[in-house]
């Protein structure tokens, strides 16, 4: 009998053994020379993962929501106009946060399963000057993938800051912060970054830092104020001790370990691995006669899949049966559709074998509940899609990404 269940929700995810080992190491002082080196190295590695050699990184004890709050607290003042581009629950959350800081907020909400067109965004940007716009790269509630690159270009065109909520995308989806002109890219530690919950991570452009420095009013939120955190980040990068609030020492040791694993794999290869696995997994889901929330594969996230329950199948019963097969997936999050769909995470060190286990558990549960499908169909479809991808890659230029997806990356050692 298996002693634990495979955690396949959209965060927290399954973590590398090396990361968990680092988390369990003896806690040192936050001004110990060894820890100062770890913190400084983590800040440097963030620039590599974010593709932002010019950015200012922040590592703060907190959640992804704190990272969102920090961006708003430091860049938005009362009366500023903010445009929120929403594809689900977390777009609306950014509106709530901006409203708390006195912003005049306009929200563009995409129809369920769709994204906002660039034409609609530009039309709104023409109506008045927006100080900032927010983009949810992957909305964890819907599995919708937005394309931040052209939106960031529009923001630059209209002298507007661009803030990317990358909570469910950083280290899983393609992001080139400096090249694309994104001003803030933020995330939490527990998703594709691959570290247990507890760290808010941000990368801030020189432009955004200058806007912050030229604020007319003090930052209202004491804990989120970059005035308190910037000297700490700079000190650690210079390998000097510093203190504002005690950092979560073990989490940061785990973060350095995970960032090294990510950088060893390589961002290009890591993103491609996520894309290949997600495409095959969606094909497997489709073969089970399940409809995903994203209406096209082009806007479907590569870090999670959101799909509707089949007609006549009780969601709670299905999730329980899957859990009895030692796999944990998540229910819905959108309040108006919470009981109508489920979500499966496939990010970080996820492997082929993980997704085979998920499809097998899902397929068995559906069959037990009377869903009319062919036994083994999802596994066959998934495997065939992977083999097709591998053959295509081999023919083009080699198969490094394909080798990565077949490795169980949770057993990779990094010096």
Label the predicted regions:
Residues 55-83, 87, 91-95:
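Conserved beta-loop-alpha segment that forms the PLP phosphate-binding cup at the N-terminus of a helix
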Residues 14-15, 190-283, 287:
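Active-site C-terminal subdomain of aminotransferase-like
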Residues 4-61, 65:
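A glycine-/small-polar-enriched, mobile loop at the entrance of the PLP active site in fold-type I
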Residues 291-322:
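Conserved PLP-binding catalytic core of the aspartate aminotransferase-like
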Residues 178-190:
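Conserved active-site segment immediately N-terminal to the catalytic lysine
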Residues 2, 336, 340-415:
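PLP-dependent enzyme catalytic core of the Aspartate aminotransferase-like
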Residues 115-171, 184, 192:
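Active-site phosphate-binding strand-loop segment of PLP-dependent enzymes
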